[in-house]
Amino acid sequence: MIARIWSGESPLWRLLLPLSWLYGLVSGAIRLSYKLGFKRAWRAPVPVVVVGNLTAGGNGKTPVVIWLVEKLQQRGVRVGVVSRGYGGKAAAYPLLLTPETTTAEAGDEPVLIYQRTGAPVAVAPERAAAVKAILAAHNLQIIITDDGLQHYRLARDIEIVVIDGVRRFGNGWWLPAGPMRERASRLKTVDAAIVNGGVARAGEIPMQLAPGLAVNLRTGARCDVAQLSNIVAMAGIGHPPRFFATLEACGAHPQKCVPLADHQTLAPADVQALVGEGQTLVMTEKDAVKCRAFAEDNWWFLPVDARLSGEQPDKLLEHITSLVR
């Protein structure tokens, strides 16, 4: 229902316009207060790169963060990541991730980024606190903040926006009548706009999510996902249909697709109940970090990597590395 409202297919968005105007006024006032100097943002002693969205919902932001971390690591840059840790609840903040940190404590995306890249990761509702903690523990040259484009209390040197190339900005309205956290005109002020799927427009960086081999949660064995049979597909991400479409494009045709809420807590019994006798469960990598502790033999995940095309990605990386002292 919410997807139909935000796309404009359902006329119900009109009923939510008063709340959207209120959201827009408040969010605009907050940004303006920092722009005019009434409020002061905290500036870190190292460059900060924000990777965020203008819209709510899954746009492919986490794969972009992983891509950026790995590219900077390849250039010898010491990079760390901070996040709000949405979906997790730690005993105390800021929380520096370790191999023992769970998604219940830190949230699924920070744990995924930590496991995939090996980079230091810290979470806290107040991102400045996370930055201070991670810099106290590690000698880093640059910080990437996973989400937080609208978190103006933390000053930033580079802003990168990730856009869903198929859904774009829906009906163009602020939350809750539409998907917008800020108006599309905000794109004029960011350093780069990366478009996940669809058709990138002038000045935007095209990106595709490239699937790898399916990985068994228990053994780490790998195989072509099309070789798996009797598949039940599960996706607890911002836009589950994208994952199901990826499976189809890989030649894997699920018998059943189970969309879950983004950041949803997954109880072992609930996940186990999805799979019948002789069936194979295939999930996203973000779901896998929550399920690995209680995984069964026939559970697999399909990793995806961001593939950015054209000359602009290299120019963006050169711009970012030029800030490193």
From Swiss-Prot:
It catalyses: a lipid A disaccharide + ATP = a lipid IVA + ADP + H(+). The keyword Kinase applies. One of its GO terms (cellular component) is plasma membrane. It comes from the Bacteria. ATP binds at T55, A56, G57, G58, N59, G60, K61, T62. GO terms for molecular function: ATP binding; tetraacyldisaccharide 4'-kinase activity. Its EC number is 2.7.1.130. Pfam families: LpxK. One of its GO terms (biological process) is lipopolysaccharide core region biosynthetic process. Keywords: ATP-binding, Kinase, Lipid A biosynthesis, Lipid biosynthesis, Lipid metabolism, Nucleotide-binding, Transferase. Pathway: Glycolipid biosynthesis; lipid IV(A) biosynthesis; lipid IV(A) from (3R)-3-hydroxytetradecanoyl-[acyl-carrier-protein] and UDP-N-acetyl-alpha-D-glucosamine: step 6/6. It is an enzyme of class 2 (transferase). Belongs to the LpxK family. HAMAP family: LpxK (MF_00409). Transfers the gamma-phosphate of ATP to the 4'-position of a tetraacyldisaccharide 1-phosphate intermediate (termed DS-1-P) to form tetraacyldisaccharide 1,4'-bis-phosphate (lipid IVA). This is Tetraacyldisaccharide 4'-kinase.
